[in-house]
A protein has these predicted regions:
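Glycine-rich, anion-gripping cofactor-binding loops and their flanking helix/strand elements
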Residues: 69, 217-303, 405-437, 449-453, ...
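Thiamine diphosphate
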Residues: 38-111, 113-120, 267-286, 312-323, 327-333, 397-475, ...
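Glycine-rich, acidic loop regions that bind phosphate or pyrophosphate groups
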Residues: 106-147, 152, 245-349
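Phosphate/pyrophosphate-binding active-site segments
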Residues: 1-8, 142, 178-180, 208, ...
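Active-site diphosphate/adenylate-binding microenvironment
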Residues: 14-17, 22, 32-35, 40-42, ...
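Glycine-rich phosphate/diphosphate-binding loops that line cofactor/substrate pockets in enzymes
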Residues: 14-26, 66-72, 96, 154-159, ...
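Conformationally flexible catalytic loops at phosphate/diphosphate-handling active centers
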Residues: 122, 150, 154-207, 560-562
Length: 578
């Protein structure tokens, strides 16, 4: 909302749109003004909407993305035509691949100019078609009620995702006094699964001797976190989670084996590879989770439950397909399994032994700050309901491995697209969504610089985001792969000319300090979390540190590296000893 002593906005399309957004429950939106979207910004002056002026449109899209992830509400971003719209694209694609509900509004040249290569004209409808659930080029103000209602419904229904409304300037300026008051859209939950499919799933699970629950991001998307916890508590079935499923079970839950896949736990990967049944809940067999798909869970039948029927059998054929409401299906399973099955006791014991035997160790040799230990301590010191956002790179995997999440929405990470620069604007959006909670960003020196301009937004809004910046003066994950798989032929990964991040933060008016020694970690983290406003902790780490364990590309999860392959490779046994 902006204060003004000037005239009220006319009853035009732009004004109608701001009122419709208010009716849909939108309170905060992120954007950057420009020529073709100026009527909308004029209407904002008389609106209750809180507009956050970012410093780059990609920041707007990613902030709306983070807002939606943290709040389970629709994120809204706004940009002008041409470069403004194209700058949104990465954030929109990230939302599409991670199933994040967003409504993206772009200005467009006036309808008589469409197709004339007018100044800042861009076919954003065509440009975004592969990365949205639906898009509209609104050619008449009379279409606005239908378009807005459909946009918010489609963004939220079924498998959530982004939609885009491309709004020509003359449509924004057109008289809208005759349009009806907007009625908020309603969303029907996914249908309940067929009873026959549920019965088949129950029978398969009851017959299994070595079942594993494989939980993905669909648990949170389907509001089924508590349903999953109740089911696992009752059945005591060992459970693994994907990157975006982390937190579906608390990290300290006795039946949680942690994350599976390329950088997952040995216990999780061993359990999956040895299992005779996978109960797949809201997961999609992503390559980072499965490793070499043909050798993934080679002995297991698959029961696949998902709200998105198109995901079932897309990559791994399901023996039992259960499309529909995930929470409904889990509750049915819970009713069928009120207590653990005795014939699965040996399996539970074996998985528990793996969990204990292969628990992460934090006593790494050397003097450098050990990032896994530091992140574990950060997770312990931060409030239990803290939101931890991260960027993409080695630190992203360390966060997934060593931070403890009590709910999937406490963990904001760019899973499918792997967007460097995601973290800072996403944390910003999360802080607006959760003003009374601690929001921490863990970033790396490579990712941080990609959207560093949003420090200005955080400072201006006095958002109390806490930033832990891990600095190894390189593109760490690229360097690690060049070390392991490209014969240590290092190419274009040196960031030793990074700026002074403490001085940089202070220029923006953000409190900042640097630590270099292990003895400084406790005090540095405590001071960071105690800051009342935004703050940055610059952490120097070993430039040669790698993320372990690691499943090499195009290999089975039964093969995990614990160190440079020039030294040794350890393989996971595939069967329980008799």
């Amino acid at each position: 909302m902006n204060s003004s002593t000037h005239r009220s906005a006319p009853a035009n399309g732009a004004r109608w749109l701001t009122q419709a957004l208010e009716a849909e429950g939108v309170r905060t939106l992120f954007g950057y003004p420009g020529g073709t979207i100026m009527p909308f910004y004029d209407a904002l002056v008389d609106s209750s909407l809180k507009h956050i002026l970012v410093r780059h449109e990609q920041g707007a899209a990613l902030a709306a993305n983070g807002f939606a992830r943290a709040s389970n509400q629709v994120g809204v971003c706004v940009a002008t035509s041409g470069p403004g719209a194209s700058n949104l694209v990465t954030g929109i694609a990230d939302a599409m691949l991670d199933s994040v509900p967003m409504v993206c509004i772009t200005g467009q040249v006036a309808t008589p100019l469409l197709g004339t290569d007018a100044f800042q004209e861009l076919d954003v409808f065509g440009l975004t078609m592969p990365i949205v659930k639906h898009s509209w080029l609104v050619r008449s103000v009379d279409d606005l009620p239908r378009v807005v209602a459909d946009a918010f419904r489609i963004a939220r229904e079924g498998r959530p995702g982004p939609v885009l409304i491309d709004l020509p300037k003359d449509v924004q300026l057109a008289d809208a006094s005759h349009l009806p008051v907007h009625v908020p859209s309603s969303v029907e939950p996914p249908p309940a699964p067929a009873e026959a499919a549920i019965a088949e799933a129950i029978a398969a699970l009851a017959a299994a001797e070595k079942p594993v629950v494989y939980a993905g991001g669909g648990i949170a998307l389907g509001d089924a976190v508590q349903d999953l916890r109740d089911f696992v508590e009752a059945s005591a079935i060992p459970t693994v989670m994907t990157l975006r499923g982390l937190g579906a079970l608390p990290a300290n839950h006795p039946h949680s084996l942690g994350m599976l896949g390329m950088h997952g736990t040995r216990a999780a990967n061993m359990a999956v590879q040895e299992s005779d049944l996978l109960l797949v809940l809201g997961a999609r067999f992503d390559d980072r989770a499965t490793g070499k798909l043909a050798e993934f869970a080679p002995f297991a039948r698959v029961v696949h439950i998902d709200a998105d029927a198109y995901e079932i059998s897309k990559l791994r054929s399901a023996d039992v397909a259960v499309p529909g409401n995930v929470g409904h299906a889990i509750r049915a399973l819970r009713a069928a399994f009120p207590s653990p099955k005795a014939h699965q006791d040996a399996w539970r014991k074996r998985c528990a032994q793996h969990r204990e035997r292969f628990a992460a160790r934090y006593d790494a040799p050397g003097q450098h700050i050990y990032a896994p230990a530091m992140l574990k301590r950060l997770s312990e010191l931060a409030p239990a309901d803290a939101v931890i956002a991260c960027d993409v790179g080695q630190h992203q995997m360390w966060v997934a491995q060593h931070c403890r999440f009590n709910h999937p929405r406490n963990h904001l990470t760019s899973g499918a697209l792997g967007t460097m620069g995601f973290g800072l604007p996403a944390a910003m959006g999360a802080q607006f969504a959760c003003p009374d909670r601690t929001v921490v960003l863990v970033s790396g020196d490579g990712s941080f610089m990609m959207n560093v301009q949003e420090l200005a937004t955080i400072a201006r809004c006095r958002l109390p985001v806490k930033i832990v910046l891990l600095d190894n003066s390189s593109l760490g994950m690229v360097r690690q792969w060049q070390e392991l798989f490209f014969a240590e032929r290092y190419s274009e990964i040196d960031l030793s000319d990074n700026p002074d991040f403490v001085a940089l933060a202070k220029v923006f008016g953000i409190a900042a300090t640097r630590i270099d020694a292990r003895d400084d970690v406790e005090g540095g983290l405590a001071a960071l979390l105690a800051e009342p406003g935004p703050a940055l902790l610059h952490v120097a780490i070993d430039a040669r540190a790698n993320v372990w364990p690691l499943v090499p590309p195009n290999t089975a999860n039964s093969t995990m590296l614990e160190s440079n392959p020039a030294h040794a490779r350890q393989e996971i046994p595939n069967a329980i000893p008799a």
